[in-house]
Amino acid sequence: IQEVLWRIYWKGWLELRPGVWADYLINLKTHREKYKTDKNYLNAIEGNTNIQCFDDWVKELKETNYLHNHARMWFASIWIFTLDLPWELGAEFFLKHLYDGDSASNTLGWRWVAGIQTPGKHYLASEWNIKKFTNNRYEKIKLNESAKPKASTKVYSVSKNNFSNSEINDVKTLLIFDNNLSFEFSDFKDKKFNKILIVNSIESREILLSDNVMKFKKSLLQDQLKRLKNLSIDCEIVKIEDIKKYGDDVCALYPSVGENLDFINSNELKNIQFLYRKIDQLSWQYCNKGFFNFKNYIPKIIQNIS
């Protein structure tokens, strides 16, 4: 339960500070241009750093599209402090290759390792820790174990958002995005929507996905389509560009801060009425501070859900 709520917390934290995501994308574009021919960066993404554990994780990530949480932390720390590469590029590399890549937990996790999510507190990978938890698989791991946290003077104020749901009628068309593909288990499963549109934004992203991740996400879209049709629900998959042509009778399972919401906002699609999950409504109000403060409210959140 705590692991699930970790992700919900990260999403809520970013919802209250959407400027963090916006600034991440701005800085990412700058670093892409600066490092596009940088040998150190190119060696890192190809797994040619001569740091065996890191190179193995690059290969594992590209082939399996997954890394254990320990490996993710070690990877990010080595990227930032030993290879001295911008955390923004590392976060992009993860989003490109992870099946479970998420704009909030990924961005904020990399910020935490760097020492800017919790200012002055960073995560430094160490040789002994890697050896211990990999059963001494690796030897002579030369890392920068004395690096200082990355500095950031930017302070983000907490925004006051309204996550309440307005009354919806049954004639509306519903949009579902790729991070909400369980409609039949959602809070809105009993609503009789006119039609459900499953939005494909896989090829229309600022951060391009690997072929494996695109295939995986497309299979999830098809699976949701199949399950909805089995329930005799009128539905189809549409490209994200096509949602601009729908009128006012449109609502959407809220996609959260990230690329799908960016598309909606950049195209000024103000006609879309967002629907928020109950667990998010209950949780995000407590995301104004750190996780350990949020953790105190978990029993209350669970009680209110049930």
Explain the meaning of each model-derived region.
Residues I1-Q2, W6, K11-G12, L16-K29, ...:
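Trp/Phe/Arg-rich N-terminal binding region typifying the photolyase-homology
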Residues I1-D170:
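Active-site-proximal binding-pocket segments
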